[in-house]
Amino acid sequence: IGVCNIPIGMKMFIRDVLMLKDSDDLSIDLFGLNHMVFIKDVLVNGKSRFAELLDGVASGQLKASGVKNIFDLPFSEGLIRSMNLLPCSYLLYYFKQKEMLAIEMGEYYKGGARAQVVQKVEKQLFELYKNPELNVKPKELEQRGGAYYSDAACEVINAIYNDKQAEHYVNIPHHGHIDNIPADWAVEMTCTLGRDGATPHPRITHFDDKVMGLIHTIKGFEIAASNAALSGEFNDVLLALNLSPLVHSDRDAELLAREMILAHEKWLPNFADCIAELKKAH
């Protein structure tokens, strides 16, 4: 079972904007891949309130749920209404590539790439964590991203250990439960959790066809990248990068593959032969 922090943030957002009471039962039909999920229905005490939620987000009256490490841009009304789905904030990287790249480049010139910013934040955090008297959540943690991971993880553990039979949104191998996804794929979706693990929700047996193209593209990249990590072969890395929708040129893919493999040599023992060949070519 894989845990993601995005759904719990979306759930908190829904409870807030629909002004639900603690006693209200909230059930969400959520599907997709890790960090790439869509909501297709929201049930409050057994009745759907999805149309109300979607209309509020699409019209801009309700501010969509986001996370600290992603810039807060609204999806267009046309996109939301044409999909009739509520996308998570990570979908901005696919539906607003041009805008997100411009923002990221601006951030890079101001203070470095996101990874460099995270390294600085983590260094500060680990210094603070050395203090055994620390009993508050450091403000620096808000700059890190990954909000609510601890909540999500503890709730999943609680549901399994205590056989809660509770609704959670996790990554699982679906074993054929979804009829239009290969049976051996891992997916992120609404599940019921208890002592036997995660069971896919019976309401979700088919992923919405409108976004299946994107889901297949991203999963194809994930599989190719996993194969490359195992093989240590340059051509496998090249294939994965060329399949990514965020890489727009085969030439860029090759330059990126060479540069990143050499830059991270000490972390890539499986690529020793590949790295030796790349150095020889230089």
For the regions a language model picked out, list residue spans one by one.
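Short, acidic/small-residue loops that bind anionic groups at enzyme active sites
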Residues: I1-I8
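Long, compositionally biased stretches enriched for glycine and/or charged residues
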Residues: M10-H282
